[in-house]
Amino acid sequence: MASGTTIQPSRPSLTSNDSAVLQALFDAESSPSSAVAIDPSLSPFPEYLHISASDHESLKARELSIIRSLQSDDVSMDTITSAIRDLDALITEHPTYPSAYVNRAQALRLHIEKTAEASTDPEEAIFTPGNTESASRLFSDLGQAISLCTPRSPADPVSTVQARILADSHTHRGYLLLKAARLKKNANGNEMVGGPDKLRDMGPDQLEEMASRDFFFGGRYGNKVAQQLAVQTNPYAKMCGAIVKEALRKEVEGVI
């Protein structure tokens, strides 16, 4: 009687370089460039913004007095509108103060979601035609905050204040880009009729790549959620993942 033979599926062999590439693609924290030097001893903002530490304290106090009014669970439209006007004035007086742009973007988003029709998902209200102007302002504010806070050289360290603003702004913008990408996909290629003007003519894949880039930078500056979203939206990670899955499938099928 013949003895039974068990066929063991072979395990795909990866070189150390292959493993390193896969790790870098799928692990948001594995790459040496995935983090930046955050120096708590630095002044809140770089010198070229002309905001001293004492200026920052007074601006922060004024800003906090504005945004505290928005902390209520059922904040009124009048309160939101008033806060946006106050932030407008603050930005007009101090156009290089990045944090005010971040908070005005938040206030604009709150205003948009508050005015959403009952039949509209509040998180999708920003992409309705009636909110195009506000959505464009919101997107512009996030871009301005990022532009002001981004170090002139990638090797330059950033302050804890800079890092927080960059993490928040990149993550917020990445979320909006990802939302726009998914809405475009659901529209089956039809043009998005609302949302920020800059995004109107972009395709879903381009929007998702931009979102991935923003999540990458949000993660670099310390946002843990952005780190994970950067991996999930990374087109190269997706492509590599598909290749690996296909190779594994063929490897298994070849020995059965």
UniProtKB/Swiss-Prot annotation:
InterPro entries: TTC36
Phenotypic consequence of gene deletion: Impairs growth on L-tyrosine as the sole carbon source and affects homogentisic acid and pyomelanin formation.
Alphabetical keyword list: Cytoplasm
GO BP term, pick one: melanin biosynthetic process from tyrosine
Similarity section: Belongs to the TTC36 family.
Gene Ontology CC: cytoplasm
Function: Part of the L-tyrosine degradation gene cluster that mediates the biosynthesis of the brownish pigment pyomelanin as an alternative melanin. The 4-hydroxyphenylpyruvate dioxygenase hppD catalyzes the conversion of 4-hydroxyphenylpyruvate to homogentisic acid (HGA). The protein hmgX is crucial for this conversion and thus, probably functions as an accessory factor to mediate specific activity of hppD. The homogentisate 1,2-dioxygenase hmgA is then involved in the cleavage of the aromatic ring of HGA and its conversion to 4-maleylacetoacetate.
Induction: Expression is induced by L-tyrosine. Expression is positively regulated by the cluster-specific transcription factor hmgR.
Compartments, record wording: Cytoplasm
Protein name in UniProt: L-tyrosine degradation gene cluster protein hmgX
Gene: hmgX
